Regions:
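Pro/Thr/Ser/Gly-rich low-complexity, intrinsically disordered linker/stalk tracts
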Residues: 2-27, 63, 80-95
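Residue-level detection of beta-strand scaffold positions
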Residues: 22, 45-46, 66
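Extracellular low-complexity, O-glycosylation-prone stalks/linkers
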Residues: 27-47
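Short, solvent-exposed loop/turn segments that connect beta-strands within catalytic domains
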Residues: 40-42, 78-82
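Short S/T/G- and acidic-enriched coil/turn segments that sit immediately N-terminal to beta-strands
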Residues: 52-57
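Beta-strand-rich modules
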Residues: 58-80
Length: 95
């Protein structure tokens, strides 16, 4: 549902790494973090993060290269998993 769609920020504070930070959406929500070197295709899932952590670090990226990130939420209710829309895509040049 739309109210589960996360808002994200991305920063590269260390070499070959990016940190993605998002707003928490409550208990039982998981966050899937995706990244790509192209804005509109080629996304890979970097991690699925449990509800209490509002951030993830993606490692082993290429220095001086631009990457794109997006996050979506999932919540399982009575055995059925619901997915949010993806966050707005954010890009960053890796240190």
């Amino acid at each position: 549902s739309s109210d589960l769609t996360p808002t994200i920020k991305v920063k590269s504070s260390a070499k070959k790494k990016a940190q993605i930070i998002w707003n928490l959406k409550g208990n039982g929500v998981k966050y899937q973090v995706y990244y790509s070197t192209k804005k509109n295709k080629g996304y890979k899932k970097a991690a699925t993060i449990n509800s209490s952590k509002g951030k993830a670090t993606v490692k082993k990226l290429k220095s001086k290269k631009k990457y794109y990130f997006k996050v979506r939420c999932s919540k399982t209710v009575k055995g059925h998993t619901y997915y949010s829309a993806y966050s707005k895509i954010k890009s960053i040049k890796i240190k």
